[in-house]
């Protein structure tokens, strides 16, 4: 069994929490995999299935909670504290502190967006990058979310439209509609399902204020700072080997993901049949095989 180590990295006077899966039988040919979670502010727990690569192939796997969430939670900050550069600079700080100078990179959702920003800035020491359901343009993401909503029952569409109008997503009707959307396109389970993944519950419990500031009140509208997200030109400069990973039932729809695949030079793409946004929650084996199959080519 992998030895799980926990540590903290100093960052801006705060502490960034890191969790490291150290293989019992490490393969020296396998470079470490650094995993970036989504949100911003969703924390690392829901991606822990990728830690299984430590036992399976002898690969070191590193997770961290980005500043402002989970075990890297901080006191309330003014909105201008939370910027893209906050997490970009943290990425390089964590790597330097942990000696991660020769790695593979994985990012889910916002984590993939963050990874793209970092690879556009400085890709030194990154051998490959798996971009898991991450948009290069937020408006495409929103247009597709609105298209997916039209396949839901009319009363649920109406409830979410009313929630968007009032800003109140806490009504029973809006909660039920959001749960249905999350079951179909995000988690793959209803909140009331006894099989709802514990790792997702733990991530939800650790969400920080940065989610509301950057994203907004829901997955269907972006009212925060990410509303102008568009890196279509920037990703053309990414030089390292990349693979997009997404699901057919993903809120990051194939149309959304293809936009990035077409722009990132020589980007490959693995599309998992029936998988939602958190594909590893419903299709863990397919995700592990896809990720290891890609990154092992660049060890």
Q: What is the meaning of each model-derived region?
A:
Residues 266-299:
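Catalytic active-site module of serine/aspartate enzymes centered on a nucleophile-bearing elbow/loop
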Residues 101-144:
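Conserved hydrolase catalytic core segment
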Residues 14-74, 78:
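Conserved HGGG/HGGXW glycine-rich cap/lid loop of the alpha/beta-hydrolase fold
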Residues 129-168:
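Flexible "cap/lid" loop of the alpha/beta hydrolase fold
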Residues 232-275:
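Conserved loop-alpha-helix segment in the C-terminal half of the alpha/beta-hydrolase fold
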Residues 1-15:
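N-terminal cap/lid segment of alpha/beta-hydrolase-fold proteins
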Residues 150-151, 158-240:
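Alpha/beta-hydrolase
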Residues 63-110:
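Active-site loop/oxyanion-hole signature of alpha/beta-hydrolase fold enzymes
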């Amino acid at each position: 069994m992998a030895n799980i180590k926990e540590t903290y990295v100093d960052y801006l006077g705060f502490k960034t929490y890191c969790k490291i899966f150290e293989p019992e039988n490490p393969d020296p040919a396998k470079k470490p995999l650094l995993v970036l979670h989504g949100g911003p502010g969703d924390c690392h727990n829901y991606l822990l299935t990728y830690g299984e690569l430590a036992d399976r192939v002898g690969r070191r796997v590193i997770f961290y909670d980005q500043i402002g969430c989970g075990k890297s939670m901080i006191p309330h900050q003014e909105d201008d504290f939370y910027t893209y550069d906050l997490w970009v600079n943290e990425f390089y700080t964590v790597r330097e502190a942990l000696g991660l100078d020769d790695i593979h990179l994985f990012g889910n959702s916002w984590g993939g967006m963050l990874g793209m920003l970092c690879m556009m800035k400085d890709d030194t020491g990154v051998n490959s990058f798996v971009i898991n359901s991450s948009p290069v343009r937020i408006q495409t993401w929103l247009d597709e979310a609105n298209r997916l909503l039209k396949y839901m029952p009319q009363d649920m569409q109406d409830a979410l439209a009313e929630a968007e109008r009032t800003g109140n997503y806490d009504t029973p009707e809006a909660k039920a509609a959001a749960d249905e959307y999350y079951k179909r396109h995000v988690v793959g389970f209803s909140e009331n399902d006894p099989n709802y993944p514990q790792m997702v519950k733990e991530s939800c419990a650790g969400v920080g204020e940065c989610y509301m500031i950057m994203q907004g009140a829901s997955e269907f509208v972006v009212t925060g700072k990410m509303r102008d997200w568009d890196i279509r030109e920037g990703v053309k400069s990414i030089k390292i080997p990349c693979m997009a990973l997404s699901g057919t039932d993903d809120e990051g729809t194939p149309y959304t993901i293809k936009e990035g695949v077409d722009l990132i030079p020589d980007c490959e793409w693995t599309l998992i049949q029936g998988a939602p946004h958190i594909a590893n929650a419903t299709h863990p084996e397919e995700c592990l095989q896809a990720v290891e199959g890609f990154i092992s080519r660049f060890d």
